[in-house]
């Protein structure tokens, strides 16, 4: 029996579900669109159900939502102070959206929207545009002090300022690439190991014995991917709070 090895990249392909075009614009409803909506709906339903509980003893869902709430609130307060709480809806929405999207992508035949650079870059740009918009609205031209560190000798000030500007505008790139690359690499690794298991089993009795180690590795990597799914949402949230601090307190 001959079989073709599964393509580990095929799972990231964007496919049209409903063809929609307006003039020369392709506005088709794709699998990415579907899972974006599914992520928003799943997150909203979970938060609605968990916040509807009125019992004296919190349910498991209520405890999870309270932990998420306290994590975002405490991270914002530590990074930006009390003023940072005005960004709570944004940061909490980003955290829950990324976390749920990452978890949904771990289920077989489900799509991982955070493995698409266009999704992660859009989320990162939302953060940076919020920082720039709020910074100029709150501080005016004083927001530019962010790029002029205090205590720097005048001789090297232009060089340091240029480095600060480059560093600032590279933030959406690093923020989006970190999430995208981790989710992409993890799912490719899982696909490779699972494909190897299927190929070994197709060889018969001898292949079944040889598939035990890859199976153990697949289970271990799957468990690790659940941890990575949380850690990536955690890191994105912490960095978002740090960047928002620059908008609240632009002076070094």
From Swiss-Prot:
Q: Name one GO molecular function term.
A: proton-transporting ATP synthase activity, rotational mechanism
- Keyword Membrane (UniProt): yes
Q: How does it sit in the membrane?
A: Multi-pass membrane protein
UniProt KW Protein biosynthesis keyword: no
- Keyword tags: ATP synthesis, Cell inner membrane, Cell membrane, CF(0), Hydrogen ion transport, Ion transport, Membrane, Transmembrane, Transmembrane helix, Transport
Q: What parts of the sequence cross the membrane?
A: 29-49, 87-107, 116-136, 146-166, 183-205, 219-239
Subcellular location(s): the record lists: Cell inner membrane
Q: Name one GO cellular component term.
A: proton-transporting ATP synthase complex
**Entries under PROSITE patterns matching the protein:** ATPASE_A (PS00449)
Q: Which NCBIfam families does the record match to this protein?
A: ATP_synt_6_or_A, PRK05815.2-4
> What does the UniProt record say this protein does?
Key component of the proton channel; it plays a direct role in the translocation of protons across the membrane.
Q: Which family does it belong to?
A: Belongs to the ATPase A chain family.
Q: Quaternary form?
A: F-type ATPases have 2 components, CF(1) - the catalytic core - and CF(0) - the membrane proton channel. CF(1) has five subunits: alpha(3), beta(3), gamma(1), delta(1), epsilon(1). CF(0) has three main subunits: a(1), b(2) and c(9-12). The alpha and beta chains form an alternating ring which encloses part of the gamma chain. CF(1) is attached to CF(0) by a central stalk formed by the gamma and epsilon chains, while a peripheral stalk is formed by the delta and b chains.
Supply the name of the protein. ATP synthase subunit a
Q: Which organism is it from?
A: Bartonella quintana (strain Toulouse) (Rochalimaea quintana)
Gene name, Swiss-Prot/TrEMBL: atpB
